[in-house]
């Protein structure tokens, strides 16, 4: 993946998230440790370069653990450099719930999953939806997010009502 597109993603993301850190796989556990507020829940990461195994993150949380978690950790399926947006995929590990319930969301992004713009992202989505339908498997659903949850439904802008109040992105560059 071009370092230019990774830099563009990081710069765009920093306009709407609390932090965006670029690291190597060897730095993952210490970076995660610095960002996590316990108790923490997570969905198993499909990444080949990093894992939540051996961390304080519970990857098989109960409903109670999910409800009391301060931090949720998921991996983005696709990241869009143009806007600093990420997608949370619907996977068996409960990525959507883990990304929405805790007030702090840590998003792991493999640099190879960063695309330049929404057109490229939707081309990836189209392929994934087609594959899911052809194979009769879940995974076609995606949540597209740019920054923390914000709403002005009742007048004043409020953060964290319909999702996380804080978002921290960790980009893994191999």
At which residue positions do the language-model features occur?
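The feature marks the mature, well-folded catalytic cores of soluble enzymes
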Residues: 1-174
